[in-house]
Regions:
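Carbohydrate transferase catalytic cores enriched for Leloir-type hexosyltransferases
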Residues: 1-369
């Protein structure tokens, strides 16, 4: 019998640093509950998450609220609490959708971890002073524990898989079992709305998001193009950042999820810059909302998007200008074709099936096609 304890008790949509990880955690819980060969599924949830879960009857929800009440509660959960609950549930597997094992205790059951990226390792090399030393040390030890103590690791992309394997080799750890499960999206029920003469720029205070570079590129594009609309800047930036002012720049800060979707839908193009990602969700969401994305041509984003969207080189202002001009002239029919292609490639049903199939293999059980 295949049984899984699934931990989402340490997540809170109001405080999460990654809405993508939160969406994966809730969506995957739902589609795992729909997998016929997963016979037992216990969801360790909390009062902020349970209302976002749509589960089949086989799933049993147990609320554990202390991990979201304080930092110490979260640390206790990470290092001891989740293992205590996994032992009590007596399922053979514990699934960690945030991807971090305890580095203090050994798991009482087999662990399957979903690792989204190794951003902390990237920052330790590229921006070593950005993350506080204690926090950086904590997550570095958690990543090592995940590589060493997981029976299997799932990732969102081939790029993330290669990063994990490289990390294991470079640190002298035993090569882990890493399976690309992928990431999923659902069709947008509403038809694309009427476009306004606006461009949406995702901004972020994290240095790997290259906000200053994107603003610089857009400033030149505004100067050289005949675009007379508005640049909506979605997200938070460092207080020390010198933001452009004037009627064409609209700095919004952080907004609710529903409002961000509307901002994407009304824009003629979405700009997403980055130098490191494990997958890259916003460009896909832009296409699904009927808007052309302009995005950095880094490995993970190119893998995720395939032949869709308008990529540009972070090292080339001219490639950005060309990508913007292509995006604003993109035909709605092309965007519809891209949307259908991306939905075929990235489905939650396929993600959960890959995960369950691998757990069945690990258990020596037969996979039913």
């Amino acid at each position: 019998m295949l049984g899984v304890t699934y931990s989402i008790a340490d997540q809170n949509v109001a405080t999460t640093k990654s809405i993508g990880i939160y969406n994966l955690s809730t969506s995957l819980a739902q589609t795992l509950s729909e997998q016929p060969q997963l016979e037992r599924l216990t969801i360790l949830s909390n009062k902020t998450v349970s209302s976002d879960l749509t589960l089949t009857a086989k799933a049993r929800v147990e609320e554990c609220n202390y991990p979201i009440l304080s930092r110490w509660g979260r640390i206790w959960w990470d290092q001891w609490g989740v293992y205590q609950r996994a032992r009590a549930e007596r399922n053979p597997w514990l699934f960690l959708p945030k991807g971090f094992c305890s580095f203090v205790a050994r798991p009482p059951v087999k662990v399957a971890a979903y690792v989204h990226d190794i951003m902390g390792n990237f920052y330790s090399r590229r921006y070593p002073s950005y993350i506080p030393k204690l926090e950086s040390h904590y997550f570095a030890k958690s990543l090592r524990a995940t590589v060493c103590r997981s029976s299997v690791i799932f990732t969102n992309s081939n790029f993330s898989r290669s990063e994990l394997l490289d990390f294991a080799r470079q640190t002298g750890l035993k090569e882990p079992k890493v399976i690309v499960a992928g990431f999923g999206f659902r069709p947008i029920k509403e038809k694309p709305g009427e476009k306004q003469n606006r461009v949406l720029l995702f901004v972020n205070k994290a240095p790997h998001k290259l906000t200053s570079l994107a603003v610089s590129f857009l400033t030149r594009w505004l100067r050289e193009s005949n675009f007379n609309g508005v640049i909506d800047c979605l997200g938070t930036v460092s207080p020390a950042t010198q933001n452009p002012t004037g009627p064409q720049w609209n700095w919004l800060g952080r907004v609710a999820l529903g409002q961000s979707r509307e901002l994407i839908r009304r824009a003629r193009a979405v700009v997403y810059s980055s130098e490191y990602e494990g997958f890259g969700i916003p460009p896909v969401e832009a296409v699904l909302e009927g808007t052309c994305p302009v995005f950095s041509d880094i490995p993970a984003l190119c893998e995720t998007m395939g032949e869709t969207g308008c990529p540009f080189s972070n090292d080339s202002e001219s490639s950005f200008l060309a990508a913007m001009n292509r995006a604003l002239s993109m035909a709605p029919a092309t965007l519809q074709e891209w949307s259908e292609s991306l939905l075929q490639r990235h489905t939650w049903a396929a993600v959960s099936k890959r995960i369950v199939d691998e757990l069945l293999v690990q258990e020596g059980l037969q996979i039913i096609k």
